[in-house]
Amino acid sequence: MVKVANKYAKALFDVSLDTNNLETINEELTVINEAVKDKIEQLKMVDSNPTQTAEQRRELINGVFTDINPYIKNMMYVLADNRHISLIADVFKAFQSLYNGHYNQDFATIESTYELSQEELVKIVKLVTQQTKLSKVIVDTKINPDLIGGFRVKVGTTVLDGSVRNDLVQLQRKFRRVN
C-alpha cells in the first residue's frame, strides 16, 4: 500500500508545485496527519465497510475536513472513492519526503545520554549538514542512557554514531577478528 500512497503524494506534490501552494498544502497536511494519526484503525473500518457508498465516504470527508485546501480535499475524495482513506498517514509521510527533498532538508533524531545544550546541538547539526550535504536539518532529540556517552544521529537511512557504546562494539569486533 506504500506504493499507492506514494502515487497520491506525488500527484499532490506536483499540483502543489504547479499552483505555488507547496507551503500551504504541507502545513495543512501536517495538521490533518496529527488529527488522524490515532484514528487509522477507524479509517480502515470506513474503507472496508461494504455498505458505505463512495458518496457517503465523501460526505464523511466534508463533515470532518470542512475548511481545507481544495487540492487536498480532491485528493481525499479520490482516497475515499478508492477506499484508501486509511492511507492518509502514508500519503503524508511520502509527501513529507518529497517536500524535504525539494528543499534539501530532512529530519534528524539526535540521541545522547543527557539533555544537550543549545551550543552542543548547533555543533552536531553543523556536523550533520556537512556529512549529509543537507541545507537544513530538522532536529528531534532523545535521551538514551544505553549509549553510555557521546551521541548518535539518525537522518533517513544514515546513522552517524559517535557513542561510547558504538566504540565498545567496534572494539569488540576487532578483538574477535584477531582471535
From Swiss-Prot:
Its main location: membrane. The keyword Membrane applies. Pfam families: OSCP. It is found in: Cell membrane. GO terms for molecular function: proton-transporting ATP synthase activity, rotational mechanism. PROSITE patterns: ATPASE_DELTA (PS00389). It is a peripheral membrane protein. GO terms for cellular component: plasma membrane; proton-transporting ATP synthase complex. Keywords: ATP synthesis, Cell membrane, CF(1), Hydrogen ion transport, Ion transport, Membrane, Transport. InterPro entries: ATP_synth_OSCP/delta_N_sf, ATPase_OSCP/d_CS, ATPase_OSCP/dsu. F-type ATPases have 2 components, F(1) - the catalytic core - and F(0) - the membrane proton channel. F(1) has five subunits: alpha(3), beta(3), gamma(1), delta(1), epsilon(1). F(0) has three main subunits: a(1), b(2) and c(10-14). The alpha and beta chains form an alternating ring which encloses part of the gamma chain. F(1) is attached to F(0) by a central stalk formed by the gamma and epsilon chains, while a peripheral stalk is formed by the delta and b chains. Belongs to the ATPase delta chain family. F(1)F(0) ATP synthase produces ATP from ADP in the presence of a proton or sodium gradient. F-type ATPases consist of two structural domains, F(1) containing the extramembraneous catalytic core and F(0) containing the membrane proton channel, linked together by a central stalk and a peripheral stalk. During catalysis, ATP synthesis in the catalytic domain of F(1) is coupled via a rotary mechanism of the central stalk subunits to proton translocation. This protein is part of the stalk that links CF(0) to CF(1). It either transmits conformational changes from CF(0) to CF(1) or is implicated in proton conduction. This is ATP synthase subunit delta. It comes from Staphylococcus aureus (strain MRSA252).
